[in-house]
Amino acid sequence: METATLVTIFISGSLVSFTGYALYTAFGQPSQQLRDPFEEHGD
């Protein structure tokens, strides 16, 4: 394969992995440990 093809595949895979990890952190099991500043603020 050409170098440009390998670089493109690597960058695309990195972006997909980062997006998946971000979604897992936001909506998956670790999201229960995140603090919600809107719930902490009393009206």
UniProtKB/Swiss-Prot annotation:
Protein keywords: Chloroplast, Membrane, Plastid, Thylakoid, Transmembrane, Transmembrane helix
Subcellular compartments: Plastid, Chloroplast thylakoid membrane
Pfam family, one: PsbN
Chain's role: May play a role in photosystem I and II biogenesis.
Topology term for the membrane: Single-pass membrane protein
A GO cellular component entry from the record: chloroplast thylakoid membrane
Chief location category: plastid
Full protein name: Protein PsbN
One Gene Ontology biological process: photosynthesis
UniProt keyword Plastid, yes or no: yes
HAMAP family given in the database record: PSII_PsbN
Family membership: Belongs to the PsbN family.
Transmembrane segments: 5-27
